[in-house]
Amino acid sequence: LLSAPMAEQPDIIDLSLPLNGTPRFSPEDVCLIAVPCFGGRAPEIALERLAQTQGGGARAILLSVYGNRSDEDTLFELKGAAMRAGYVPMAAVRAVAQHSIVPAIAAGRPDEEDARRLAQFGRVIRDRLTEPNAPPLSLAKKGLLRPFGGLPVHPRAGKPCTGCGKCASLCPVGAIPSRDPSQTLETLCITCMRCVAVCPVHARRLSPLVVKLAGRKLKKKCARRQEPELIF
């Protein structure tokens, strides 16, 4: 949605999986660096893999996606990581998607209004990047980076699991054994919920009680609709 006005067929590097080699860029390149927000922070594994790339002075647009509560200082953290990897951040976007733990929160998002605004942001960023003296991103820190130690709950596979292994092959941190994909290695799992999203038979899920309790806790904090935000 955001990149469409800037590139019809962008090259995609998936930071959710181990990198194959070292991606290298140059000042002629424009990179959209996107991460989800976990507890107000950028996922450590995403930042580690970003550090394995070589920005080479490429201009970067930063994107933080959160579940309608707050992304806190995710973008500030991502900006620092991008600069250390050799990128030059030029713009940043906060966007909302359906909450990964409690799908009833921000259900159906990004929706049509989100799509319209993100496409508009893409056009504005595209035009900005053509300006010869466009300044780099100015992004103030909201507060102290709040520690996030992960969640004490993890998805498990139920009886419908066919053992196809798709979840194991796509787990960002290798927390699902390929020989027994019905299991979850809790010491590795970051509760990103990717396994739940990709399971073809919907066998993986969190405990319904956990989802219900989390929904009660987040209901007030997430009641007001948050809108996408563009920052220069």
What does each model-found stretch correspond to?
Residues 1-14, 25-150, 207-232:
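FMN-binding flavodoxin-like domain, especially the glycine-rich phosphate-binding loop
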Residues 11-19, 178-181:
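Short gly/ser/thr-rich secondary-structure transition/capping motifs
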Residues 135-172:
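A mid-sequence, solvent-exposed acidic-amphipathic segment
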Residues 19-25:
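Structural motif
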Residues 157, 162, 166-190, 194-211:
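Iron-sulfur cluster-binding cysteine motifs and their immediate structural context
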